[in-house]
């Protein structure tokens, strides 16, 4: 690089830092990439049992600034997901539905220390474009686009309950903490519309009414960590700074009511007719557990996680993911 240009850049950065408030002189930017898979088994008295297998890839970024007792941040993510739904009749498969989804989300949050814990308030927007296809190459039905949009706002309080640490003169220091959390979230789902088509043309138009829901969550987290001091030489700089393992368990409850779904066909025809059905309210209670492990370096982190959840007696799911994230500084 040009020495003069390098010096000018350093001088500009120093001058900018001198004139900016201390709160924005160190603004971390976190970027990440993750991949995961999930399997969901559904069995209800009103429909045939089915299994959904999904694979997803997510890219996310966050900008956070603040001080010791408060934080303000913006987060965004983009997820592409492929799903394979298999309906079953006994031991034989009857029908498969392949689908893809592109999902974007953005969130603004404020996090502040409340007593010995932390409270977080957020506003979140999520939009997804779903595509469906079922059948063989020549005889099939497909829905090219079903746009879904969700707005939500929530509050989460986290409280450390017990903690301990042990210092080591020759090896890594150790620490552990047990925390509890509780939160409440309001969600609004916009109307959605899509058309099933065959090679001959439109078959059915689906219109889903808007809906609202309130979700509550409560649970606990146990975290244990090993802390490594930076050493001399190349290995001392690149070795991990922290290894941690955590176990999270939570109980979630959702109250949302039913949602009307209108089915119209043939779409746009002179003989079109409409039928209004009611989508059942989701299961009221759901529990989930997650086991996670992470390796942290000075400016990056690698995370592994696996989870299992159950909603009532009809929905069981399990999955896992791996994520790599990096920390950058704007200034």
Name what the model sees in each region.
Residues 1-120, 124, 141-331:
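Secretion/assembly modules of Gram-negative surface proteins
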């Amino acid at each position: 690089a040009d020495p003069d240009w390098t010096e000018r850049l350093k001088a500009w950065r120093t001058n900018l830092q001198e004139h900016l408030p201390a709160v924005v002189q160190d603004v971390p930017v976190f970027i990440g990439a993750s991949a995961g898979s999930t399997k969901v088994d559904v069995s209800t008295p009103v429909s045939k049992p089915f299994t959904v297998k999904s694979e997803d890839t997510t890219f996310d970024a966050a900008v956070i600034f603040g001080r010791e007792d408060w934080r303000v941040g913006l987060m965004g993510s983009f997820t592409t997901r492929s799903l394979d739904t298999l309906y079953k009749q006994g031991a034989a498969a009857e029908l498969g539905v392949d689908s893809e989804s592109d999902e974007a989300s953005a969130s603004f949050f404020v996090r502040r220390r409340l007593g010995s814990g932390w409270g977080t308030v957020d506003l979140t927007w999520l939009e997804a474009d779903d595509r469906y296809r079922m059948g063989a190459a020549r005889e099939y039905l497909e829905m090219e686009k079903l746009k879904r949009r969700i707005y939500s706002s929530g509050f989460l309080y986290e409280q450390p309950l017990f903690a301990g640490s042990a210092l080591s003169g020759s090896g890594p220091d150790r620490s552990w903490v047990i925390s509890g959390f509780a939160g409440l979230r309001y969600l609004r789902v916009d109307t959605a519309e899509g058309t099933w088509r065959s090679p001959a043309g439109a078959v059915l138009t689906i219109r889903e009414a808007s809906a609202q829901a309130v979700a509550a969550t409560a649970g606990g987290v146990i975290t244990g960590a090993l802390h490594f001091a930076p050493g001399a030489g190349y290995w001392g700089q690149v070795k991990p700074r922290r290894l941690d393992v955590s176990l999270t368990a939570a109980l979630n409850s959702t109250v949302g009511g039913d949602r009307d779904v209108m089915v119209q066909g043939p779409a746009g025809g002179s003989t079109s007719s409409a039928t209004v059905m009611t989508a059942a309210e989701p299961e009221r209670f759901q529990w989930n557990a997650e086991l996670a492990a992470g390796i942290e370096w000075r400016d990056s982190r690698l995370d592994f996680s696996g989870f299992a959840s159950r909603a009532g007696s009809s929905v069981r799911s399990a999955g896992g993911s791996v994520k790599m994230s990096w920390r950058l500084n704007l200034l």
